[in-house]
């Protein structure tokens, strides 16, 4: 946004600072109007109608692009005419590899001193008044109405394609890894396919799958050896061993709350049975004087508890 604003403002200042054309220049411009129709910078149809189409008329944009493309082709044809005198140079330049041209130019610049390196001069000639007026109007609309050309372009239906980036690269034949440096300084295509992250990720995935498969096989083998079946004689011993192992494990797993309370055995008293023949009547003296007697039947058994 800021860069575009600066460009428009600089162009607007350029239009203000430009000197008014003299009558002679006007006459020359009138004579060259026919040439402009064929291949000038701006055609006559490129005028006020373009501003009315900025509101979103896509057909207007397409027509404008077609006109600009035709004009650029005409300009290229006109600029190429003076060079037609030297067909040998053109054929030699076409035969040479672009990388060789870049390398030779880079080598030539690297061997130059800083004082010899200069910025190329401005192109000769002036922009037409028609183009300057258009830039001035675009700048005024941006300042007053807040018009954003980038938003208008992005709102077009053609830019809603999710693969527009890849399509533009293919259409323009752009090398994303390319560079303007010569190969002796930097060669972006000098790396092998294994050096890129796609190949590294693929190799890593293969190794991880191998490790996961080996881990599953080890777990399966351990499980099978634990439940392997033997002969009938070994089956009985295996069952006995398994049962004893299970009991031992169960005893080991018992906590203090699972253990039974120890019971102390108490010796029971021994009961002695004595049979005695007693007289039919036993006289018991209840007092020292012997004044009262009690008769007790003496038939039966007398139980005596042994002393502990």
Swiss-Prot record:
Glycyl lysine isopeptide (Lys-Gly) (interchain with G-Cter in SUMO2), cross-linked positions: 95, 220, 304-305
The protein, known as: SAP30-binding protein
Positions where Phosphoserine occurs in the chain: 18, 22, 43, 52, 113
Lineage, top ranks: Eukaryota, Metazoa, Chordata, Craniata, Vertebrata
Keywords tagged on the record: Isopeptide bond, Nucleus, Phosphoprotein, Repressor, Transcription, Transcription regulation, Ubl conjugation
Family: Belongs to the HCNGP family.
Record field: compositional bias (Acidic residues): 16-26, 57-78
Superkingdom of origin: Eukaryota
Keyword Ubl conjugation: yes
One of the GO biological process terms: regulation of DNA-templated transcription
General function of this protein: Plays a role in transcriptional repression by promoting histone deacetylase activity, leading to deacetylation of histone H3. May be involved in the regulation of beta-2-microglobulin genes. (Microbial infection) Involved in transcriptional repression of HHV-1 genes TK and gC.
Segments of this protein annotated with the region Disordered: 15-101
Assembly: Interacts with histone deacetylase complex subunit SAP30.
UniProt keyword RNA-binding present: no
InterPro entries, per database record: SAP30BP (IPR012479)
């Amino acid at each position: 946004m800021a860069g575009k604003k600066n460009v428009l403002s600089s162009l607007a200042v350029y239009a203000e600072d430009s000197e008014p054309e003299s009558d002679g220049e006007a006459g020359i411009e009138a004579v060259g109007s026919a040439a402009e129709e064929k291949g000038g910078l701006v055609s006559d149809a490129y005028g006020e109608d373009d501003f009315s189409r900025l509101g979103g008329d896509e057909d207007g944009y397409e027509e404008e692009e077609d006109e600009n493309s035709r004009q650029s082709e005409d300009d290229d044809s006109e600029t190429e005419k003076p060079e037609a005198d030297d067909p040998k140079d053109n054929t030699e330049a076409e035969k040479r590899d672009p990388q060789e041209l870049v390398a030779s130019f880079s080598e030539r610049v690297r061997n130059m001193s800083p004082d010899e390196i200069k910025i190329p001069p401005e192109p000769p000639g002036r922009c037409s008044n028609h183009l300057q007026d258009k830039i001035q109007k675009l700048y005024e609309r941006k300042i007053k109405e807040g018009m954003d050309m980038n938003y208008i372009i992005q709102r077009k239906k053609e830019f809603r394609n999710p693969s527009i980036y890849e399509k533009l690269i293919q259409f323009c034949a752009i090398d994303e890894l390319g560079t303007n440096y010569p190969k002796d300084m930097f060669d972006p295509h000098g790396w092998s396919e294994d050096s890129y992250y796609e190949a590294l990720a693929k190799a890593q995935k293969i190794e991880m799958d191998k490790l996961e498969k080996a881990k599953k096989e080890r777990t399966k083998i351990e499980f099978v050896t634990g439940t392997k079946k033997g002969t009938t004689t070994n089956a009985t011993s295996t069952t006995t061993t398994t049962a004893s192992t299970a009991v031992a494990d169960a005893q080991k797993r018992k906590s203090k709350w699972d253990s039974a309370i120890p019971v102390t055995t108490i010796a029971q008293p021994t009961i002695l049975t004595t049979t005695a023949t007693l007289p039919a009547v036993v006289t018991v003296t209840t007092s020292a004087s012997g004044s009262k007697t009690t008769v007790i039947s003496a038939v039966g058994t007398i139980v005596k508890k042994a002393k502990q």
